[in-house]
């Protein structure tokens, strides 16, 4: 009678095999989590950079538009008195004021408005008054262009030299600077805007 030999195959897993599988699974999950977190962080950083770049570009366009459309007429104070200047700028006060032509959908009022740029609470702020000669110092539309601004410097070119205020003397009261420069730091990055007003004539009464 032939001898029958049978083999018993254990289809289950041993405790060691289960533990090894759990360790491998944990490592896979950890690596996947790290990769996912890194991808999300990269996406957030990219999104922030795009937003900052977009904000910078838009702000630059607005500032350049205002300055290139400057109207060379004497400014008045809130009492209607002439200020002996067609543009007033002071790097110490971090402020520049002038009249500019602003596009409007309404034909009921003059397109010439008083525009003011200044550093306020570490932000580059644009104020647009409702007329070229406002009598109410609080009647304006305010726009925060750039936040977290440090070391803002405003300078004005005349006779190939930069000056930190305008007008620099009586001879420059009726003219516009050749160039206007904004230098500032945002998020530890330095930026420089140099804008040409495109006005080479003096105001005459």
Regions of interest found by a model, annotated:
Residues 9-36:
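N-terminal single-pass transmembrane signal-anchor helix
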Residues 40-133:
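Extracytoplasmic beta-strand-rich oligomerization domains located immediately C-terminal to a leader/signal peptide
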Residues 131-143:
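Short aromatic-glycine motifs in intrinsically disordered, low-complexity regions
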Residues 109-114, 139-140, 177:
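Short, surface-exposed coil-to-beta transition loops
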Residues 150-205:
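Short linear sequence signals and composition-biased patches located at protein termini or domain-edge surfaces
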Residues 113-115, 141-143, 189-193:
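Short beta-strand segments
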Residues 73, 143-156:
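Structured surface patches comprising rigid loops and adjacent beta-strands/short helices at the edges
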Residues 1-11:
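N-terminal leader/signal peptides at the extreme start of proteins
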């Amino acid at each position: 009678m032939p001898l029958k030999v049978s083999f018993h195959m254990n289809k289950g897993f041993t405790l060691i095999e289960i533990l090894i599988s759990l360790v491998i699974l944990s490592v896979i999950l950890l690596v996947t989590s790290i990769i996912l977190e890194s991808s999300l962080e990269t996406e957030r950083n990219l999104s922030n950079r795009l937003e900052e770049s977009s904000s910078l570009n838009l702000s630059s366009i607005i500032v350049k538009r205002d300055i290139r459309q400057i109207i060379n007429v004497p400014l008045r104070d809130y009492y209607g008195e002439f200020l002996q200047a067609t543009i007033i700028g002071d790097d110490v006060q971090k402020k520049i004021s002038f009249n500019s032509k602003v596009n409007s959908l309404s034909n009921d009022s003059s397109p010439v408005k008083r525009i003011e740029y200044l550093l306020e609470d570490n932000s580059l702020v644009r104020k647009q008054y409702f007329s070229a000669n406002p009598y109410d110092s609080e009647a304006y539309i305010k726009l925060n262009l750039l936040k977290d601004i440090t070391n803002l410097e405003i300078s004005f070119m005349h006779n190939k030299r930069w000056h930190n205020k305008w007008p620099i003397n009586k001879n420059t009261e009726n003219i516009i600077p050749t160039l206007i420069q904004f230098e500032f730091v945002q998020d530890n990055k330095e930026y420089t805007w140099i804008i040409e007003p495109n006005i080479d004539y003096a105001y005459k009464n």
